[in-house]
Amino acid sequence: MQKSIYIILIACLTLIASPTNVKAQQVIGLNEAIKTALKNSYDIQLVENSLAIAKNNNDLGVAGALPTVSATANDNKTNSTLQQQYTDPTRNTTKSGVDGTNVTAGLTASVVIFNGYRIMATKDRLAALEKQNRSLLEAQLQNTTSLVMQQYFNVIRQQAYLKTIEKSIEASTQRLDIVKTKQQIGVANEADLLQSNLDLNALLQAKQNQLLIIDQAKADLLNTMVLPTSTLITIQDTITIDAKLKLAEVEAKMKLNPTLQSAEQLININQFIEKETRALTYPTLRANTGYNFTSSQSAAGFSLLNENYGPFVGINLSVPLYAGGASKKSIKNAQINTSRAKIQYQSAEQDMSTALYKTFQTYQNNLQQTPIEIANYSMSQSLLQLVLQKYQLGQATMVDVKQAQQSFETAGFRLISLRYTAKIAEIELKRLSNQLTF
């Protein structure tokens, strides 16, 4: 009866974990997960918007290199009192309610000829800002790809843990069957039966907890993919590791890391700001041209109509003489910002180099341990089967079985952990050296 109950429990748990439970589950691969995340990611969309703004601003007009053209027009009506006095008093005039109209219109074009090369520096800065935003987008693409890969392989890791637990459940079920058989022939006591039941129950609970961990790991992946967490997905994959990475190669490619390149571009941006600020101390020469029209009409007075119209051309020169020392302070502040950007770059490079070195050590160490752990896992499987056989023959104790079972579980978990840690280190090394593909 008890055996039937445990079989039913195991069947129910299997049904819960089954991909065909309630709704059909979508089988998803790594490439599909990455493509979906890159397409839907809010973080990527925000960076793309910043890049679009920087691209729009990278223009000669924004930099001030193109002429500015403006048009003006005014039409004023007046009603006034006219009083005129002449040397001949008989010509004196005083008149109220005199209507008048004043019309002015003009078209003006202006272009900067020289302003201390500020326009060139501004255009270079805008181009550098666009380039920096492209690097930031590349960095976000790399980061999102890395996160998806880590979460994807975490699901695989948790599923592998589940398989180890299920194999241990099979061993516990086999042990329980042996105890029941021994009890029937009078060579096993009630304590052995109770202990076997307790051990099996503990594993069944562990399986249920592991199913929850898997569901939550999938929810994290779905969140990064910007899909509803209720989406049912199945991942049928294994952890394969690229064991060919070399420290010298990834260190050489670290210079290509977009985050590091963005920090380097910030130095250039601040250097261009320095040039823009310094240009404020130079004279500004501007050429102006246009066309003006003025018309003045009056119902009375000496002049009933007066009109002027025609083109004009001119040169405007502005020379900054004194501004309270503000220009010098602005230049000094710009130089400080450039120095700070250089320090930030050096700090980022140092941190990244250290992280790369430590990650490579982890990667190499786990690769070196993996063959030994594979052998340990294989031996633990053989040991468990051997001890179960001996226990059935009365040549081993329940303690021996439990120890063999614990060794099997530990070896299984350790092997999975080694592979996962090595894979995560590989992903991080490729991210740091800008080698992740998407």
State the predicted function of each range:
Residues 1-36, 86-89, 211-249, 430-438:
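Terminal intrinsically disordered/low-complexity segments used for targeting and assembly
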Residues 22-70, 74, 229-271, 320-321, ...:
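Bacterial Sec-pathway N-terminal export signals of envelope proteins
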Residues 25-26, 72-108, 236-243, 275, ...:
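Small/polar, glycine/serine/threonine/aspartate-rich low-complexity segments that form flexible
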Residues 32, 56, 143-254, 362, ...:
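Periplasmic alpha-helical coiled-coil/stalk elements that build and connect Gram-negative outer-membrane
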Residues 45-49, 62, 113-141, 191, ...:
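Sec/SRP-type N-terminal targeting helices
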Residues 205-227, 378-435:
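Short segments within alpha-helical structural elements
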